[in-house]
């Protein structure tokens, strides 16, 4: 008996040994790890157009400075995952970072590398396709750890119009309409974020800042607006509050349960309302349906809503449910997307019930049934109406998608176009690009046979209708950020101080009132365009509003290509998100440029010089003192053996250029040696420049990337800058005479072809402040600029006077020239320069009376050495000798 028990015990021990050994090894492995990465959340929610901080912290399992600790900086990698695809967002090690081009200017590590335990990621300007899983991975030596979190971007922008007519809302009416349907009027940032996520709508609509815009992914003749040939958000600028347009609404949180009521006999609108009330709910609003769709609701069944419209949400498109695009589909009576079905027609109904636990996102689409006819998408031919040149406005017709509805609630059943491949989610859809509808499609839309209408609307459980509210063109087939990766220093990773995606403009008198979205907003008509004003539009004068000039993302600069895996950085400096970058000048030489008073009164930027530098020598504790630059206010850091030295711009002093020696006048703002004042009053370019000159300034010149970021972020409007080619076509010069040291043109700009008069330059602030040339008679806001340090009137001399008209202020480095009065001869240098301390150089010119006969002797007597004529004097004229 005892041997049997011993054998059983031995067998039990041998059976348990592998598992126990594995547990011991696992514990040993866990204890042997140097650190563990934790995010601390399973799901995070962000708001469309907003910013989201994704936490990620490193927890050390043994002292970080122990003998076994790896030297150098840990390697941090953030990855975006969607389905079976992975996209690298950024990789950082110390002060070096590599950022995916699709995330450039949108991601930052606010604490790293100052804190090696906080590698949290900040993702700004959230888009719909930013929803997915984000993984944080940290590697240090041979140790690595990672954690992941799901991110959901909530919020949806949609076009809304009542069934009666297209373009029927004033600005106040638009706000009320969005509130009536359980939403609010969208902001420019939200519309732009939706556009970046693939949204397209060829219908002009109000936004919260009283501007009128519409997003276009695929430029086409009828939807070109003020950005002919380029994708982007078309913009009319601020228009009159009584003008009539559609409205873009924004819905975000559902805060309850939305469910489909589908009785066998269907319901009229009044019966649908009572149906919901009997179940302790109310008939859902349009905004609530959009919010539920954004949360995952997928129902291929048209149902009544509170505003009398009939709609249904589609997440997974199919051939029988409206084609290959996800979105909320709407049934219209007419091909121009107007007319809701009669309230006596019978449909299902969408009800909404307040609940602490919304369940709309868990709704699933109904199963497919065979033999069902498809919902027809009827398109109307696109048109473009152009006004004559004096009007500078035109009207565009939107792409039309609607379903003719019969009196019994049925719709057409013509064969739909071949659908694109059905994606799994709205953010993964890849569809055929929308092309302008043809004549045949329009004729099909008005010739639907009565017997081909729907017989049973329950068949709509597998059928969908397209409203072209969410368009994923072939060019944007992949919602995942892709593209080349560039490497930057960490100071370049953080997003700029400006919110790049803001589109607003301050209220001011708007452009001429023209109803309908313009196809060529504020642009002269092309050859062959009509010469009469189309009906429904009033003739307007030459004074125009502010267009948006491009929606094409700015091309990024390529950086170095060294790998992050090469080892830790040797530049341990604290990094944090920064705004405009510091101006750096690699030398101390003075500018050799000469500015005459007749052509310029300002030269920006003023480069640091020996005389301008009020800074001393600061001793630094280690090498790499100038990375990042310790100098403030645009000062230049120079490394020296004993430390570093800051060369200050005029107006600043101190060891680190942090002491202000001069200050701007009240109402002006200082930045890196210049003063700026913004005017929201809209003027033509010439009027704006004249107004600036009356203040002793000029329209702003942009000479550095830092100045570009400051002006664009500080004054978020379309605005004039001083660049123009009014003198010679194609030769762009700054109005203040500053050298052309920096350019930030929009792709394809400047494009003033055929002498169209686009001779002045506007800064389009929401496109990272990129520039476009436009006609000078546009009325835009503007910013004036003058030097922080300037000189007053030049010294007056009794026998000499300056060239040009006197001015009250002269910028640093401005050079004036004296000339002697008639009958006097000049001696010594006639030039004086405005110095960095705001004082003129002492004049050295002297004027003496001319000696009699001087002019004759200058023509006859040799002036140079050895009897040679001076190089700059003409040879005496001798009459030809006779042969």
Curated annotation (Swiss-Prot):
Annotated S-S bridges: 56-136, 178-249, 202-223, 276-351, 300-321, 626-637, 631-646, 648-657, 664-675, 692-784, 760-776, 791-834, 820-847
Domain Link: 156-251, 256-353
Pfam families: EGF, Lectin_C, Sushi, V-set, Xlink
Basic and acidic residues bias locations: 581-592
All copies of domain Ig-like V-type, residue ranges: 35-154
Domain C-type lectin: 658-786
Tissue expression as described in the entry: Expressed in the retina, specifically around the inner and outer segments of photoreceptors, retinal pigment epithelium, outer plexiform layer, and the ganglion cell layer (at protein level). Brain. Expressed in the brainstem and cerebellum in a perineuronal net pattern.
The UniProt record lists the keyword Transcription: no
Signal peptide: 1-22
Keywords: Disulfide bond, EGF-like domain, Extracellular matrix, Glycoprotein, Hyaluronic acid, Immunoglobulin domain, Lectin, Phosphoprotein, Proteoglycan, Repeat, Secreted, Signal, Sushi
Keyword Iron tagged: no
Function of the protein: May play a role in the terminally differentiating and the adult nervous system during postnatal development. Could stabilize interactions between hyaluronan (HA) and brain proteoglycans.
Subunit: Interacts with TNR.
Family: Belongs to the aggrecan/versican proteoglycan family.
Record's protein name: Brevican core protein
Organism, as annotated: Mus musculus
């Amino acid at each position: 008996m005892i041997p049997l028990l011993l054998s059983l015990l031995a067998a039990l021990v041998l059976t348990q040994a592998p598992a126990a050994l594995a547990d011991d090894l696992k514990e040993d492995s866990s204890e042997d790890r140097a650190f563990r990465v934790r995010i601390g959340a399973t799901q995070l929610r962000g708001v469309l157009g907003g910013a989201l901080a994704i936490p990620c912290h490193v927890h050390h399992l043994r002292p970080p400075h122990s003998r076994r600790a790896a030297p150098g900086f840990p390697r941090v990698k953030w990855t975006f995952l969607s389905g079976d695809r992975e996209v690298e967002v950024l990789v950082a090690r110390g002060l070096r970072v590599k950022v995916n081009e699709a995330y450039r200017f949108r991601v930052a590590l606010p604490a790293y590398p100052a804190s090696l335990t906080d590698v949290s990621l900040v993702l700004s300007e959230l888009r719909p396709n930013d929803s997915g899983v984000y993984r944080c991975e940290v590697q240090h030596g041979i140790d690595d750890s990672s954690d992941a979190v799901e991110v959901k971007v909530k919020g949806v922008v949609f076009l809304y119009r009542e069934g009666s007519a297209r373009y029927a809302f004033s600005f106040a009416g638009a706000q009320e309409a969005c509130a009536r349907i359980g939403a609010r009027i969208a902001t420019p940032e939200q519309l732009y974020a939706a556009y970046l996520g693939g949204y397209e709508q060829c219908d002009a609509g109000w936004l919260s800042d009283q501007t009128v815009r519409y997003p276009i992914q695929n430029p086409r003749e009828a939807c070109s607006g003020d950005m002919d040939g380029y994708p982007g958000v078309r913009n009319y600028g601020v228009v009159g509050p009584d003008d009539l347009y559609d409205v873009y609404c924004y819905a975000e949180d559902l805060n309850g349960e939305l469910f489909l009521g589908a009785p066998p006999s269907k319901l009229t609108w009044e019966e649908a309302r009572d149906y919901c009330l009997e179940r302790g709910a109310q008939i859902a609003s349009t905004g609530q349906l959009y919010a539920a769709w954004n949360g995952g609701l997928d129902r291929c069944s048209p149902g009544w809503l509170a505003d009398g419209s009939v709609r249904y949400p589609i997440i997974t498109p199919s051939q029988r449910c409206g084609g290959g695009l996800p979105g909320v589909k709407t049934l219209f009576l007419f091909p121009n997307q107007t007319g809701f079905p009669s309230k006596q027609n019978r449909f299902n109904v969408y009800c909404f019930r307040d609940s602490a636990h919304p369940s709309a996102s868990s709704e699933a689409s109904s199963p497919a049934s065979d033999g069902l006819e498809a919902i027809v998408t009827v398109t109307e031919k696109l048109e473009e109406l152009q006004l004559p040149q004096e009007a500078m406005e035109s009207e565009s017709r939107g792409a039309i998608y609607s379903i003719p509805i019969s009196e019994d609630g049925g719709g057409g059943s013509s064969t739909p176009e071949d659908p694109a491949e059905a994606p799994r989610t709205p953010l993964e859809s890849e569809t055929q690009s929308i092309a302008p509808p043809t004549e045949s499609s329009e004729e099909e839309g008005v010739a639907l046979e009565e017997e081909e209408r729907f017989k049973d609307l329950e068949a709509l459980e597998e059928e969908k209708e397209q409203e072209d509210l969410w368009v994923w063109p072939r060019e944007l087939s992949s919602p995942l950020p892709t593209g080349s990766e560039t490497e930057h220093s960490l100071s370049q990773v953080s997003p700029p101080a400006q919110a790049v995606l803001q589109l607003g403009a301050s209220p001011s008198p708007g452009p001429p009132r023209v109803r309908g979205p313009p196809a060529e907003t504020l642009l002269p008509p092309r050859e062959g365009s009509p010469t009469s004003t189309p009906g429904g539009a009033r003739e307007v004068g030459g004074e125009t509003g502010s267009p948006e000039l491009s929606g094409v993302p700015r091309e990024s600069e390529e950086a170095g290509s060294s790998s992050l895996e090469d080892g830790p950085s040797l530049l341990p400096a604290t990094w944090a998100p920064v705004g405009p970058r510091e101006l750096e000048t690699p030398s101390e030489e003075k500018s050799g440029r000469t500015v005459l008073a007749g052509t310029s009164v300002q030269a920006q930027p003023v480069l640091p010089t020996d005389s301008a530098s009020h800074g001393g020598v600061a001793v630094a504790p280690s090498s790499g003192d100038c990375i990042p630059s310790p100098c403030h206010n645009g000062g230049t850091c120079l490394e020296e053996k004993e430390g570093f030295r800051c060369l200050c711009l005029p107006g600043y002093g101190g060891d680190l250029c942090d002491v202000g020696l001069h200050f701007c006048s009240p109402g002006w703002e200082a930045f890196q040696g210049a003063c700026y004042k913004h005017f929201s009053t809209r003027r033509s370019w010439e009027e704006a420049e004249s107004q600036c000159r009356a203040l002793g300034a000029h329209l702003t010149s942009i000479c550095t990337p830092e100045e570009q970021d400051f002006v664009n972020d500080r004054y978020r409007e379309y605005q004039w800058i001083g660049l123009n080619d009014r003198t010679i076509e194609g030769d762009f010069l700054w109005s203040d005479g500053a050298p052309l040291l920096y350019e930030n043109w929009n792709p394809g700009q400047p494009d003033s072809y055929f002498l169209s008069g686009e001779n002045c330059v506007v800064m389009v602030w929401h496109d990272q402040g990129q520039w476009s040339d436009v006609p000078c008679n546009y009325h835009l806001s503007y910013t004036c600029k003058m030097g922080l340090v300037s000189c007053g009137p030049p010294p007056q001399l009794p026998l000499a006077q300056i060239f040009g008209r006197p001015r009250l202020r002269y910028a640093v480095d401005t050079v004036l020239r004296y000339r002697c009065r008639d009958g006097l001869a000049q001696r010594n240098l006639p030039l004086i320069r405005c110095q960095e301390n705001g004082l003129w150089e002492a004049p050295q010119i002297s004027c003496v009376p001319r000696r009699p006969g001087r002019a004759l002797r200058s023509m006859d007597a040799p002036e140079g050495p050895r009897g040679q004529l001076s190089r700059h004097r003409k040879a005496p004229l001798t009459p030809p000798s006779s042969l």
